[in-house]
């Protein structure tokens, strides 16, 4: 469960290292975001000499949360960290590599480019 002011790791090589959620895209007063939700975030830490800079406002999709994800078949998945992938306005990832495992639910939400770049889909 990601809410405003939550810090997230970045799971791609776009140049950002850490994000802070400032808004959840969707309804006007939604409190929590889960895997597959798009957020507006600010970059808190970035790699030197990268196209993305600190304090830049970007869009990202959540790929891992430490809160449990319950599937319809009864399986529960929990990750060690909260992580997101930086995306552009069309929903394509800005990076060319994805680090770590991501959830299968992203494929159902039409983030197929992110799923194809991921090394492991759970």
Swiss-Prot record:
Subcellular location per the Swiss-Prot or TrEMBL entry: Plastid, Chloroplast
Example of a GO cellular component annotation carried by this entry: cytosolic large ribosomal subunit
One GO term of the biological process aspect: translation
Pfam families: Ribosomal_L14 (PF00238)
Disulfide bonds: none
Gene3D superfamilies xref list: Ribosomal protein L14
GO MF terms, alphabetically ordered: large ribosomal subunit rRNA binding; structural constituent of ribosome
InterPro entries named among the record's database cross-references: Ribosomal_uL14, Ribosomal_uL14_bac-type, Ribosomal_uL14_CS, Ribosomal_uL14_sf
Swiss-Prot/TrEMBL keywords: Chloroplast, Plastid, Ribonucleoprotein, Ribosomal protein, RNA-binding, rRNA-binding
Subunit structure: Part of the 50S ribosomal subunit.
Similarity annotation: Belongs to the universal ribosomal protein uL14 family.
Function: Binds to 23S rRNA.
PANTHER family: 50S/60S RIBOSOMAL PROTEIN L14/L23, LARGE RIBOSOMAL SUBUNIT PROTEIN UL14M
Protein name as it appears in the record: Large ribosomal subunit protein uL14c
Organism of derivation: Populus trichocarpa
